């Protein structure tokens, strides 16, 4: 195929380039509405300002020669400038800024879960007849997904680590089909534009948020008062644009669900995916609700909150309504689908590979220690305890390096969120008891536990770079003692430490 040739269209999707043209026309219509709103809003602000100035001088300016000509010229110029600036920002940087704010990353092909996502996006893209769709992963334990359009016009589908960890293959395919249906129908173009327009005001609000340190400085109140006016106007404008997103997106979710069934051929899988996302924590990243229309379910911190859809101003129909429609397509009932979710969860628990503790594997034998064991040296690729070569392995689908003798693990700090989000590994009762004993000891005296670690830890070298490992807690929420390389951002877990961390995290999430 030549560079200038268009790819052949699939049966499902209309011409992708025609969709882009139609959405361009729609975005111009939004620009016209925005300009009209600004003319009205700025006109009111200008009139209020001039009236206040005239009242102070004892003479209102409305009867002055040429007043209304100046008024309309100033109003139109300011409105056109702000509307064009916002429109240009949304078209040029909107999608990229949203991805950056959500900390989206390209899939790691060495990660089995990420590779499955990339392959699934490619399969559904081909079925839809789209020229190109990028895949992204959001480093978040929440369960959600979205579709948007990047600055260069390329569509993108992003899913969270929590979704990859919790969803079966057919559920991942159904969610991907839903997001690609939004792209093929043109929804993603328009919603990305609307959310980016609202995001413009969000950034203005952040600029004028009061600084608590400056609040006590004399002479700053007037500046803060002016900033408050601007921030209030920005908040109102953001609300207006967000309401437009709500109005255009609510029914589009139902249409995208139907189109996803045509692409993925599994209405039950999509219903399961929507229910699981709604029942889970689906709040993604650190952002306000202006991005809500982009997601498959409205971002929320807990299940059962009003944001679950259907209530104003939600951009999504009620989850119960969506499940009822999909259940009807699958010739079943929502109750049967929920029961199927529970059955699949039990099957998954039974299929877990159960990891024993180090003591169970070695029948209580101590870890081997030779004359070089624990000695700090610059040699790389060797276990810092046994001085034996490390082997490549997959742990929760993530590449790690393992010592086959002492069962220590070297893990890149960047992949820890993936490991802790996933639950394909089970743990023996002995490991669970070991984790509980650790939690109880830590609760009684965490500082004593850290001092004990510092006393017994011997100098050790990072197997990746040779830099000296430093004894540190994993973090200050999970005070598990590990050894971190401050040079290459890797963590060395001795036998059972990573498993204990996973057990504690899973118990915390279950609470």
Model-derived regions: residue spans:
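Post-HEXXH active-site segment of zinc metalloproteases
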Residues: 187-216, 271-272, 276-279
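Transmembrane alpha-helices and immediately adjacent membrane-cytoplasm interface residues
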Residues: 67-98, 113, 122, 126, ...
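Short metal-binding segments enriched for Cys and/or His
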Residues: 409-427, 489-506
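An active-site-proximal "capping" alpha-helix that borders the catalytic cofactor pocket
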Residues: 95, 122-125, 249-266
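Peri-catalytic and regulatory segments of divalent metal-dependent proteins
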Residues: 6-8, 87-192, 196, 285-286, ...
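Short cysteine-rich clusters marking metal-coordination/redox-active sites
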Residues: 383-386, 403, 462-465, 485
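Cytosolic-facing loops and C-terminal tails of multi-pass membrane proteins
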Residues: 1-11, 18, 225-249, 262-380, ...
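Short, flexible, mixed-charge glycine/proline-rich loop motifs
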Residues: 370-380, 393-397, 448-459, 475-479
């Amino acid at each position: 195929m030549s560079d200038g040739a268009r790819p052949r269209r699939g049966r499902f999707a209309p011409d992708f380039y025609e969709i882009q043209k139609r959405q361009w026309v729609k975005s111009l219509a939004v620009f016209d509405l925005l300009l009209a709103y600004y003319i009205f809003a700025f006109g009111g602000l200008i009139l209020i300002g001039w009236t206040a100035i005239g009242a102070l001088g004892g003479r209102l300016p409305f009867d002055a020669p040429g007043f209304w000509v100046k008024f309309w010229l100033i109003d139109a110029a300011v409105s056109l400038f702000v509307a064009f600036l916002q429109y240009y920002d949304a078209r040029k940087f909107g999608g990229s800024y949203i991805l950056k704010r959500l900390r989206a990353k390209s899939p790691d092909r060495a990660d089995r879960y990420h590779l499955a996502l990339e392959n699934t996006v490619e399969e559904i893209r081909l079925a839809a007849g789209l020229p190109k769709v990028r895949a992204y992963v959001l480093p978040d334990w929440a369960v959600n997904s979205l579709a948007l359009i990047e600055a260069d016009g390329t569509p993108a589908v992003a899913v969270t680590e929590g979704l990859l960890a919790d969803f079966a293959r057919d559920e991942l395919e159904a969610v991907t089909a839903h997001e690609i249906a939004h792209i093929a129908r043109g929804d993603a173009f328009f919603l990305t534009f609307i959310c980016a327009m609202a995001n413009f005001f969000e950034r203005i609000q952040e600029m004028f948020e009061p600084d608590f340190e400056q609040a006590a400085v004399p002479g700053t109140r007037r500046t803060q008062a002016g900033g408050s006016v601007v921030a209030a106007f920005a908040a109102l404008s953001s609300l207006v644009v967000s309401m437009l997103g709500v109005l255009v997106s609510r029914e589009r979710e139902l249409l995208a669900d139907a189109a996803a069934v045509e692409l993925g051929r599994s209405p039950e899988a999509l219903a399961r995916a929507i229910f699981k996302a709604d029942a889970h924590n689906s709040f993604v990243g650190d952002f306000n609700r202006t991005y809500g229309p982009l997601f498959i379910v409205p971002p929320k911190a807990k299940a059962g909150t009003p944001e679950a859809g259907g209530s104003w101003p939600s951009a999504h129909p009620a989850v119960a309504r969506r499940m009822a429609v999909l259940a009807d397509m699958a010739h079943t009932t929502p109750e049967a689908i929920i029961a199927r979710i529970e059955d699949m969860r039990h099957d998954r628990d039974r299929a877990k590979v159960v990891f024993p503790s180090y003591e169970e594997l070695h029948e209580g034998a101590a870890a081997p220690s030779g004359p070089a064991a624990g000695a700090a040296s610059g040699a790389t690729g060797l276990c810092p305890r046994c001085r034996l070569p490390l082997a490549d392995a997959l742990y929760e689908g993530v590449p790690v390096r393992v010592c086959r003798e002492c069962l220590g693990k070297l893990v890149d700090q960047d992949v820890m969120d993936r490991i802790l989000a996933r639950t394909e590994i089970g743990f023996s009762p002995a490991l669970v008891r070991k984790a509980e004993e650790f939690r109880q000891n830590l609760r009684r005296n965490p500082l004593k536990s850290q001092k004990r670690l510092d006393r017994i830890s011997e100098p050790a070298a990072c197997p990746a770079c040779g830099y000296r490992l430093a004894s540190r807690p994993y973090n200050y929420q999970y005070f598990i003692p590990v050894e971190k390389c401050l040079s290459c951002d890797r963590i060395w877990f001795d036998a059972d430490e990573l498993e204990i961390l996973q057990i504690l995290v899973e118990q915390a999430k279950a609470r």
